[in-house]
């Protein structure tokens, strides 16, 4: 699971500035989807090859006229409780204020590793600033300037060195990892109960994990699977007994740990903004996607047509994902999900050589050439596999920076069709070949 770092502090100390500085490397990887409100409180970063999930707690609540509100709000409490460590941010210019001391006292009770960072500090006053905040009791404060990044590298290096070790390990034998993602009360617990409780399904405890584990290994028809429990669905004494609550952090962690995501929609409620935000996150994660529309049996023909039309209209950015209309309660259509999981997983495991991808690129260009730039055709030379999770195909050529987004989408769809990627978002990464004459003087 991705380690979770919560950024905590009173309003206007620079939490969002630090969050934006740390996550800016992600901004260019995935374009915003038209019509989808981006959820910017959660972001990823990679530091020294370690991926991290960051939570800007200031973005989780309206803090206007609430000096210590961020820590008191339920969402923020949940984010802190689910984090692996905390970046406690204070303001050097304002100095130590009572609100900082109140937050510090509350954080101490959490039993988490806490890093105190003093933001907006001048280099010349670093020693003075540190002494002011020593009394908070979190050891030597880290003096940073979030806007410029000064001191942030040293801070994050210490964070990495103090992350807790992974408590649970998924072994290869547990097979395909499945995450169930969806809003509260769309039927996730019912569907999980159906998946685990059907005939011929063997549920077993994995050695070294507790009954409360977020990993639930099971087998069906001699195939091994592991269900990654996302939204607080915890096993009690019996498999059939569940309690559900929504956690964005656990959902994001599960997306990145899974091989396949089943995204559950409630047919009676249609497509909501929260559905779109979650789907956008899944596309960013690059994981194989299956869409299951639940509670389908309770709709008449007209209502079903309306739901299908709403999905087509509001979810075109996931048109690569297969849809299944099911009833988790009665089991209708649930069996098809296992076949879909197998097909989606197998499609992403296929070998993809540079030769295969380059030949597909050549055919794509022959069928639909890139546009002209200043009278010259953009040339795409070859392609290779950049990453498998998320599936990233790197395309090399000349003037690729001028290639429109629409053509990148065309290439992604062409590769998906050519190699029969089932339910897999394809990311295109463009690289421009170096100009051999650049830097030479004209004669």
Swiss-Prot record:
The species this protein was found in: Coxiella burnetii (strain RSA 493 / Nine Mile phase I)
Complex and partners: Associates with the 50S ribosomal subunit.
Family under the similarity heading: Belongs to the TRAFAC class TrmE-Era-EngA-EngB-Septin-like GTPase superfamily. EngA (Der) GTPase family.
GO annotation terms (biological process): ribosome biogenesis
Endpoints of the signal sequence: none
Gene Ontology terms for molecular function: GTP binding; ribosome binding
Gene3D superfamilies: 3.30.300.20, P-loop containing nucleotide triphosphate hydrolases
Family annotation (HAMAP family): GTPase_Der
Record-listed GTP 2 binding positions: 182-189, 229-233, 294-297
Highest taxon above the source species: Bacteria
KH-like domain segment(s): 350-434
Purpose of the protein: GTPase that plays an essential role in the late steps of ribosome biogenesis.
UniProt name for this protein: GTPase Der
Underlying gene: der
Binding, GTP 1: 9-16, 56-60, 119-122
Domain named EngA-type G: residues: 3-167, 176-349
Keywords for this protein: GTP-binding, Nucleotide-binding, Repeat, Ribosome biogenesis
